[in-house]
Structures are given as C-alpha cells and as structure tokens.
Amino acid sequence: MRRYEDKHIPVMPKEVIEHLIWKKDGIYVDCTVGEGGHTLLLASISPDIFVIGLDIDSEVLNIAEKNLSSFTNVKLFKSSYVDLPVVLKALNIEKVSGILIDLGISTYQLKAEGRGFTFNRDEPLDMRMNLEQKKTAYDVVNFYSEKELADIIFKYGEERFSRRIARSIVNSRPINSTLELVEAIRKALPPQEIRKRKRHFATKTFQAIRIEVNGELSNIENFLNNVPDLLEIGGRLAVISFHSLEDRLVKHFIKNSNKLRQIVGPIIPSKEEIDENPRARSAKLRIAERI
C-alpha cells in the first residue's frame, strides 16, 4: 500500500462534491484530472452524470485512464484547461453544469523521476507540465537576464531576496540540475533566513520558475475569461488554489464578473485532512455560481 506521499489524494473532496454538484444528471468538467481523484468522485455520484476530464500532462493522464477505466460516464482528453471551449465544441456541448479546476501540482509530477519539479533530489531542470512544449526550466535558469530572473522570482515567488538569488543563479551558470539550482539559492540567502523559514528555502524560487515555464498565471486568466460563457445558468465553478497569486486572481475575477457570484469560500482544509494529506495545507476552495 502506498503512503500518502506517493499517492495523490484529492483535496477537500467532500467540500467539492457538496458545493459543485447541483444537478445529478448534469455535465461536469474536471479541468485538471491528474491521477483522477476528483473525477472518480464526480463520476461515482450517479450514472446519469457525464464527466469530461482534461489534463495537459500525458504521463499523468495515462494513470487517470487506468484509474477510471471502469466508468462509462467519463471521457478524458489530453488538453489544457485553456482549451476547454475547443473540447466542448468538438463534443457539440454548449453549456455545462459545473467546472472544477485544481491548480496544484500533482503528486505524480513531484514524485516521477526526471520531471524536475522537486528540490529533494537531483534531476534535470525541466518543470514542464506539457512535455511537448519546448521551453524548460533549464532555459529560464540559464538564459534569462539577471533582471528577468529577479523580476519573476519576486513576482511569481513573492521572494524578498529575489535580486540576490538572481545574481547567484547568473554567477553559478551553467546550472544543469535541480540540486545545482538549490545550491545557488542557498548561497544567496543569509543563514539565519534559511533557518527561520518554515518551508524549504528553495520553495519560492522553484514556484516562480515553474510558473514562468508553464505560463500558469496567464493560463488561469484565459481560463477564467472563458468560464462564464460555458456554464449554464445556476452552473458552478469550483477553484482550488495553492498560493496567494492564484487565489487573488480567482477572487478578483469573480468579484468583478457580472456573470458570476461567489457563493462559498474561501474554504480551507480541516486539520484532520491536513494531517492525512499535508499537500492540502495551503489549499483554498472558492465556489462561484453562474447568474
């Protein structure tokens, strides 16, 4: 039996089901299938529910296909959530009853060798969600200017030592692996800063580089702009975010939309869930309704 560290556990499953499902014969979309945890829960509610699942990561989608093979009311697509309108058009579906998106990185992506998302072992600098795209973390780390690096580390990582870290990265080039990058970050930070941080000192910089490689924030904006026209009246949007940049984007979009209203959130995981699944500790769930 796999431990929680090795197995992807869906975040806030009860809360997602309680607030997303309002029609037990509706069409629902899981925009980030991962290993299929949330998708399985949605499909299990009723055989009359139809679930469309998307994921841009072909490796993790293969796992989901195996996990969901017994369900006849699920259809999976290798596609980015940004392209949801294209997928629905191909299925001749104009409106759906609910849309779920989990913006966190999957356990598989962290644990699979060679993906470069983790700072806990030595791997090539990759960090691509979509293995078919060309830009990798290696390109960002080795070819961005010092100013460009400082800007993205500050903006996407909310790292106050961004300039020092960018300078250290440039001075350490070429950087070929994750642990070489960790060492460059370590050199830039005061020892007392490293000691006092609750999370690994490289977390913020790795987050920033991953966001840059995958264009995550612009993708979220594009996705959100599409959502209102894809939901039927009364339809629900459920967004699980894992850091303040994502949550602010979602919060402000819903607040400023004349087609959506927030009905629940932000919900955070219970202490019991965090004990079972530490990955959930920084998650926030917001639910909006199409009006």
Swiss-Prot record:
SUPFAM superfamilies: Putative methyltransferase TM0872, insert domain, S-adenosyl-L-methionine-dependent methyltransferases. It catalyses: cytidine(1402) in 16S rRNA + S-adenosyl-L-methionine = N(4)-methylcytidine(1402) in 16S rRNA + S-adenosyl-L-homocysteine + H(+). InterPro entries: RsmH, SAM-dep_MeTrfase_MraW_recog, SAM-dependent_MTases_sf. Its main location: cytoplasm. S-adenosyl-L-methionine binds at G36, G37, H38, D55, A90, D102, Q109. Signal peptide: none annotated. The keyword Transcription regulation does not apply. The keyword Methyltransferase applies. GO terms for molecular function: rRNA (cytosine-N4-)-methyltransferase activity. It is found in: Cytoplasm. Coiled coil: none annotated. GO terms for cellular component: cytoplasm. Keywords: Cytoplasm, Methyltransferase, rRNA processing, S-adenosyl-L-methionine, Transferase. PANTHER family: 12S RRNA N4-METHYLCYTIDINE METHYLTRANSFERASE (PTHR11265:SF0), S-ADENOSYL-METHYLTRANSFERASE MRAW (PTHR11265). HAMAP family: 16SrRNA_methyltr_H. This is Ribosomal RNA small subunit methyltransferase H. It comes from Thermosipho africanus (strain TCF52B).
